[in-house]
């Protein structure tokens, strides 16, 4: 079996996890012969090879191929795959996209934070992004709150932005951001490791966050509570060697307790875009 991007998608649809497919691809780099399906089952370490192979053979290739081709994609085997992303733990094997893939070539910074942000939190993000003077592509997750504020600030200041979503590219979540997602997909870039039609399941979003952080040289966080998803994303980013920039907030409402914790752990306190740019070498 030749491992093409379509075959990667088919392996996912047959039940292999991202990590299991990574094992197969890493093994395939070191051997010359094509792998049989039984080899893939063994190498991947899947729990029930018989069930996996049965699912694989039951797939209607004509239907799945049509689904796969609904949006362009690239895999970790392709030259356009970002090096920084390939270096993270559990790097996504396959990404669908809509928009301008050239944005992946430019320096990027991620922005994460609360979905239920305050007006002050949104304005703080807008101020920092405005101060970046379009030197960095803004990467975020198109969620409510801080994510939306980050994408909008980039657009309003004439910059570029990338949205990494936790659904298929033809699914809009939240629905209130449909127009924004369409706009970014037409003029900027939307990425997803989920195939067409895939819905917003809870576990998709922590997985999405690893891509947001992995694409970037640094992560800006605003209004992250303790034990929030944003805090976990930043802690993982620090483990991966990324810079973390925390915007401080009030000590009275608890909305920024996670940011303050990160500052204590070594994140850089930032109040302007210049604070962020000072850490980047161009």
Swiss-Prot record:
Keywords: Competence, Cytoplasm, DNA-binding
Main location: cytoplasm
GO function term, MF aspect, one: DNA binding
Keyword presence, DNA-binding: yes
Pfam families on file: DNA_processg_A (PF02481), SAM_DprA (PF18255)
Disruption phenotype: Loss of transformation. Imported DNA is very rapidly degraded.
Any Gene Ontology biological process: establishment of competence for transformation
Annotated compartments: Cytoplasm
GO cellular component: cytoplasm
Positions in coiled-coil regions: none
Induction behaviour: Expressed under conditions that induce DNA competence.
Quaternary structure and interacting proteins, as annotated: Homodimer; forms tail-to-tail dimers, forms nucleoprotein complex (NPC) which requires at least 30 nucleotides (nt) of ssDNA becoming optimal with 50 nt. Interacts with RecA, forms mixed DprA-RecA-ssDNA filaments. Interacts with ComFA and ComFC.
Family statement drawn from the similarity comment of this UniProt entry: Belongs to the DprA/Smf family.
UniProt free text on domains: The regions responsible for dimerization and for DprA-RecA interaction partially overlap, it is suggested that when RecA interacts with the DprA-ssDNA NPC it rearranges or disrupts the DprA dimer, leading to nucleation of RecA on ssDNA.
Annotated function: Protein that helps load RecA onto ssDNA during transformation. Required for DNA transformation. Not required for DNA uptake but for a later stage of transformation. Thought to interact at the cell pole with newly imported transforming ssDNA which it binds cooperatively, protecting linear and circular ssDNA from nuclease action. Forms bridges between DNA segments. Favors the loading of RecA onto ssDNA and formation of RecA-DNA filaments, triggering RecA-catalysis of ATP-driven homologous DNA pairing.
Name this protein carries in UniProt: DNA processing protein DprA
Source organism of this protein record: Streptococcus pneumoniae (strain ATCC BAA-255 / R6)
């Amino acid at each position: 079996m030749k491992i093409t991007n379509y075959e990667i998608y088919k392996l996912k649809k047959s039940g292999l996890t991202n990590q299991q497919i990574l094992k197969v691809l890493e093994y395939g780099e070191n051997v010359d012969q094509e792998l049989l399906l039984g080899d893939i089952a063994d190498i991947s370490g899947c729990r029930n090879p018989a069930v996996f192979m049965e699912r694989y053979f039951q797939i209607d290739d004509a239907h799945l191929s049509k689904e796969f081709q609904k949006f362009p994609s690239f895999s970790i085997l392709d030259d356009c795959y970002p090096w920084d992303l390939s270096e993270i733990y559990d790097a996504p094997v396959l990404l669908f996209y809509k928009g301008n893939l050239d944005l992946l070539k430019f320096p990027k910074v991620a922005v994460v934070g609360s979905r239920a942000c305050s007006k002050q939190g949104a304005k703080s993000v807008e101020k920092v992004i405005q101060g970046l003077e379009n030197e960095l592509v803004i990467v975020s997750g198109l969620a409510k709150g801080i994510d939306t504020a980050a994408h909008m600030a980039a657009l309003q200041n004439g910059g570029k932005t990338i949205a990494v979503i936790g659904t298929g590219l033809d699914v809009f979540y939240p629905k209130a951001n449909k127009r924004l997602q369409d706009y970014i997909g037409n003029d900027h870039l939307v990425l997803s490791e989920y195939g067409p039609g895939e819905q917003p399941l809870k576990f998709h979003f922590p997985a999405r966050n690893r891509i947001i952080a992995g694409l970037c040289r640094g992560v800006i966080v605003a209004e992250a509570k303790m034990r929030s998803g944003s805090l976990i994303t930043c802690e993982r980013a620090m483990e991966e060697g990324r810079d973390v920039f925390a915007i401080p907030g009030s000590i009275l409402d608890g909305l920024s307790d996670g940011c303050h914790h990160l500052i204590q752990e070594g994140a850089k306190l930032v109040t302007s875009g210049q604070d962020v740019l000072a850490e980047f070498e161009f």
